[in-house]
Amino acid sequence: MNPKLCMLLLVCLMAFYVIETVQAKLTGECPAELEKECLNRRCASPCCKNNKCHCGCGRKK
């Protein structure tokens, strides 16, 4: 593969990651990677808030 094309692809992937991370911080949501980690937790209803995993977010009091 063309080295310039590889570099362009790498830059695009890095930009996508940075944009997703910044957008998540601005909106108060968690990045996709942390969302996946939270969903793998073994609790009733895992979720991600303020960049931390929590259990029981779906429960209503």
Swiss-Prot record:
UniProt keyword annotations, A-Z: Disulfide bond, Secreted, Signal, Toxin
Origin superkingdom: Eukaryota
Where does the protein principally reside? secreted
Free-text description of this protein's post-translational modifications in UniProt: Contains 4 disulfide bonds.
GO molecular function terms listed in the Swiss-Prot or TrEMBL record: toxin activity
> What compartments host this protein?
Secreted
Which positions make up the signal peptide?
Answer: 1-24
User: Which GO cellular component term is one of those annotated?
Assistant: extracellular region
Tissues showing expression: Expressed by the venom gland.
Please report which protein family the annotation says this sequence is part of.
Answer: Belongs to the scoloptoxin-14 family.
> What's the protein called, per UniProt?
U-scoloptoxin(14)-Sm1a
